[in-house]
Amino acid sequence: MNFETVIGLEVHVELNTNSKIFSPTSAHFGNDQNANTNVIDWSFPGVLPVLNKGVVDAGIKAALALNMDIHKKMHFDRKNYFYPDNPKAYQISQFDEPIGYNGWIEVELEDGTTKKIGIERAHLEEDAGKNTHGTDGYSYVDLNRQGVPLIEIVSEADMRSPEEAYAYLTALKEVIQYAGISDVKMEEGSMRVDANISLRPYGQEKFGTKTELKNLNSFSNVRKGLEYEVQRQAEILRSGGQIRQETRRYDEANKATILMRVKEGAADYRYFPEPDLPLFEISDEWIEEMRTELPEFPKERRARYVSDLGLSDYDASQLTANKVTSNFFEKAVALGGDAKQVSNWLQGEVAQFLNAEGKTLEQIELTPENLVEMITIIEDGTISSKIAKKVFVHLAKNGGGAREYVEKAGMVQISDPAILIPIIHQVFADNEAAVADFKSGKRNADKAFTGFLMRATKGQANPQVALKLLAQELAKLKEN
C-alpha cells in the first residue's frame, strides 16, 4: 500500500526588538546569564507587564508579508503550565484570536514549479527562559530569554513531502528576513521549528495519527527527520501496526528520530484572557503605516533582476536568498557596477572568502563602493583578474580604496609597449636555450616565453597586450 505524506510546521521566530515584549530589559542575544532580567522577568509579586508597541508593529508586518487577515481587536491570554524556566507558571500568549490568520505563502520547488502553502495563524507570545543541566548535579536557570518576543507561525497541513517542507521554510525565512522583523538565525535560536507528520492511504481524506518532531536545528535536519519519519511510519503501517501519537526528536549522529514521550491526549493549558493587559484595537491607519515600511520581497526582486538586469534565474535566486547580500548587490549596481560582474564576485570570490573565514558579509571590510571600484579598474586595464583576487582579499580584510591600494602596492598592470618590449628583449637574452628551440622550429617552443614574461613582470603584464607584443617580437626573432 502506498501512503500520502501530510506535514504541518510550527515555526517560532524571535522578533528583533531592542527590548522584551513586556519589560524594558534588553532582548539582545549572547549576554552573560541573567544579565538581561528585571523584576518583571523574575515575576516578582505586584509587578505588571507593559506591552512593547514595537512587537505589535512586527506582528502586523509579519501578517501582511504572509498575506494574512489581521485581528483588529487585540488581546492576550494566559497559557498555564509549570516549569523552572517559567517563573510566573504561565506564559502570556494569544489563543483564540491571534494577530494574523488565514494566510499563505508561495514556495518554489526543486522541479521549478510553485505551490501555495496555507498559514493557519500567527500569534504573539513571550519566550521562556533556558534550563542548563550541569555535570555537578545541579540545574541552572537563565532568564535572559524569558520575555523575548516571539511570533509563532503555524502552517496548514498542506505539505506533501519533506522537499515541500524545506521549500516552505526557505521561503518563510526569506520573507521574515526581508520584512526586517527577525534575523532568523537558527544557530542562535531566533528561528525554531517543530514538525507534525502523518501518513494516510492515497484517496483518504481523514488525517492519520501524527507524530511531532523536535530538536530540528537546521533546515537540512528538518528534511532528514521528516524523510526518516516517512520511512518509519510507512514500515509500521505496512506491517499492520498502528502509529502512536508521540513526540520524537531527531538525532543527528544516528540520522534517526528517537522517542521523547508518548502523548496521551491534548495538553490542558487552561487558557483564559490576560487580566493585566487591556484590550486594544489595531486601526486601519496603523496597518497601512506598517505596509508602507515593507520592502520589495524576494520573489519580486528576483523577477526584476532577470527582466531589468539580465541575470539568469539561478543568479537571481542566489543573490536574493540572503537580504544582506541582495542589499549589497543593489547598492553596488546603483553605484554603476555591472550587474553580472557584481553577481559573479558575490557568488564567487566573496562567498569563498566568507566560507573560509567563517564570517558574514557584514563582518568584513568589503563595501559596495570598493567592490565597484575594483571591478572598474579591472575593466579599464589597471589590474588583471588574477591581481584582482589579491586586491579583493586586502579590501575584505582592511577596507579602503581599491585604486589607492593598487597604486601604493605597485600592482598596476603594465600595458605600455614602451615598457613591455624592452622586458621581452631581456627575456630573450636571459633564455638563450628557449630562443634556440624556437628558431629551430621546436613544437610549442613559443609558449615558454609567455611564462617567462609573466614571471619577469611579476604577473603585472596586461595579458592581452603582452601576448600581442610577444607574438610580434617572436616573429621578428624568427626572421633574424
Curated annotation (Swiss-Prot):
One of its GO terms (biological process) is translation. It catalyses: L-glutamyl-tRNA(Gln) + L-glutamine + ATP + H2O = L-glutaminyl-tRNA(Gln) + L-glutamate + ADP + phosphate + H(+); L-aspartyl-tRNA(Asn) + L-glutamine + ATP + H2O = L-asparaginyl-tRNA(Asn) + L-glutamate + ADP + phosphate + 2 H(+). SUPFAM superfamilies: GatB/YqeY motif, Glutamine synthetase/guanido kinase. SMART domains: GatB_Yqey (SM00845). One of its GO terms (molecular function) is ATP binding. Disulfide bonds: none annotated. It comes from the Bacteria. The keyword Protein biosynthesis applies. Its EC number is 6.3.5.-. Keywords: ATP-binding, Ligase, Nucleotide-binding, Protein biosynthesis. PANTHER family: GLUTAMYL-TRNA GLN AMIDOTRANSFERASE SUBUNIT B MITOCHONDRIAL AND PROKARYOTIC PET112-RELATED, GLUTAMYL-TRNA(GLN) AMIDOTRANSFERASE SUBUNIT B, MITOCHONDRIAL. Heterotrimer of A, B and C subunits. Belongs to the GatB/GatE family. GatB subfamily. Allows the formation of correctly charged Asn-tRNA(Asn) or Gln-tRNA(Gln) through the transamidation of misacylated Asp-tRNA(Asn) or Glu-tRNA(Gln) in organisms which lack either or both of asparaginyl-tRNA or glutaminyl-tRNA synthetases. The reaction takes place in the presence of glutamine and ATP through an activated phospho-Asp-tRNA(Asn) or phospho-Glu-tRNA(Gln). This is Aspartyl/glutamyl-tRNA(Asn/Gln) amidotransferase subunit B. The lineage of its organism: Bacteria, Bacillati, Bacillota, Bacilli, Lactobacillales.
